[in-house]
Amino acid sequence: MITDEKKDERLSIILEPGQIEASAVTPPFLHLPAANLFELRAARLEQLAEGNALGDYLRLIARLCRIQQQLVDNPPGGMPVAEARQRLCMDHGLPPLAADSLVREGPWLVWLQALLEHLSGETRGPMGEALQVLRGSDDNQRKGWGIALLAGQYDGVPAALVPFLGAALQAAWSSWLLALPAHQLKPAGSLAQCPACGSPAMAGVVRNRGKHNGLRYLACSLCACEWHVVRVKCVYCESSKDLRYTSLEDDRHAPGKAPLRAECCPGCDSYLKQNYLENDAAAEPLADDLASLALDIRLDGEGFHRLAPNLMLAPGGG
């Protein structure tokens, strides 16, 4: 049986990737997150926690997601980027919510403080200890941790603090994204780079409804913006040669129907997880990524490298 990827692969032999992208109907470039993104994410995490070896951790992240939703619904701070600066960035094809600059400017720190206030009753156990470290830190220290986390410098951030820092950062940037005139966003310099904030993609999503049906979108690890990238192309080296698709061995679906598959590139030895909503309409990039760390372990053993961050978990911190 020919899988969806095999069909795409045969097509890519006939047409170059650029020709596929420039088809008669231009695909919608963006797919923005829902206003209740974090509520949906929490529900998915709770569903996936059942029977999962990391069930307790997934439930913790679900709890943080519900707090994230409360923060987005009642923002502790406003849009930090003036309209003139937004327009200037978008006119020049630059991300208006540039993470590398805003994380240093610090408007997200009030979001972290608000998150800590929601968790003020947590004082015991490993979680209480991690929160106490955050409560006892000043803005300069918190900012330094945030900078290190978004730069992927995990040795500069205590692993136990990552979910709380990541939750605050995600809530802030997702809220700002929803306040942007996003239709003016333009593709970034790299396929795997978010056009809204410049952060790396966390995973891919092959959508199954309406004008987005059958199209692949990459989901930002920070603001949750999704942008279109043609299928059967490595998002890191842009090669379409000899890509293979790997799923969990204990998945109950046939290989070509697995709802989560990793696109593995032998050219640069990288991989990217992808959710196929046709096979599981409830899939959610961050939740399904955390629930499938066994696939990361397997691919690491095969010599493939993960370049996509998940801000709710430090590598090796599971």
UniProtKB/Swiss-Prot annotation:
Main location per the UniProt record: cytoplasm
Entry GO terms, CC: cytosol
Residues forming coiled coils: none
Cellular compartments annotated: Cytoplasm
GO molecular function: ferric iron binding
Keyword Cytoplasm: yes
Any one of the GO BP annotations: protein maturation
Protein origin, superkingdom: Bacteria
Assigned keywords, A-Z: Cytoplasm
Pfam families: FdhE_C, FdhE_central, FdhE_N
Cited InterPro entries: FdhE-like_sf, FdhE_C, FdhE_central, FdhE_N, Formate_DH_accessory
Stored NCBIfam families: FdhE
Described function: Necessary for formate dehydrogenase activity.
Family according to the record: Belongs to the FdhE family.
Protein name: Protein FdhE homolog
Organism the protein comes from: Pseudomonas putida (strain ATCC 47054 / DSM 6125 / CFBP 8728 / NCIMB 11950 / KT2440)
